[in-house]
């Protein structure tokens, strides 16, 4: 019985020491994962440094981004075609579209009084 308790105590101690690398910091209400660099299919969350620190980005997997579309920055790809006399070339440019409203655009909106009589 003593050896069983000793084995259990050693196992619990080792689990506490080893589990430090198993912990992954989450962000955006446990939807995103804090990483040094996001994968191409993941979305980068704007202002993720507030949740993950200055050296890490908050990356939202593609399957979970529909839950929080207002916080994510999506990369939109536009295709342009240029045709010359002998060859056809196609150039792809990537632009970043921010879906989150900035404080500057919010401050420009001023409320207007509305009368109840019309």
UniProtKB/Swiss-Prot annotation:
> What InterPro entries does the database record attribute to this sequence?
Beta-defensin
How does it get modified after it is made?
A: O-glycosylated; glycans contain alpha(2,3)-linked sialic acids.
Gene Ontology terms describing biological process: defense response to Gram-negative bacterium; single fertilization
Which coarse location class describes where this protein primarily resides? secreted
Which domain of life does the UniProt lineage start with? Eukaryota
Signal peptide start-end: 1-20
Please provide the record's keywords in A-Z order. Antibiotic, Antimicrobial, Cleavage on pair of basic residues, Defensin, Disulfide bond, Fertilization, Secreted, Signal
GO cellular-component terms in the record? Answer: extracellular region
Q: Cystine bridges: which residues?
A: 27-58, 34-52, 38-59
What family does the entry list?
Belongs to the beta-defensin family.
Q: How does it assemble?
A: Homodimer or homooligomer; disulfide-linked.
Stated name of the protein: Beta-defensin 126
């Amino acid at each position: 019985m003593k050896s069983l308790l000793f084995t259990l105590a050693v196992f619990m101690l080792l689990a506490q020491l080893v589990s430090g690398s198993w912990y992954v910091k989450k962000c955006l209400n446990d939807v995103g994962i804090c990483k040094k660099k996001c994968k191409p299919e993941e979305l980068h969350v704007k202002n993720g440094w507030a949740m993950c620190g200055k050296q890490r980005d908050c990356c939202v997997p593609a399957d979970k981004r529909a839950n929080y579309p207002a916080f994510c920055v999506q990369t939109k790809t536009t295709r342009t075609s240029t045709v010359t006399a002998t060859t056809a070339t196609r150039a792809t440019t990537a632009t970043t579209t921010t879906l989150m409203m900035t404080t500057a655009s919010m401050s420009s909106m001023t409320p207007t009084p509305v009368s109840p009589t019309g």
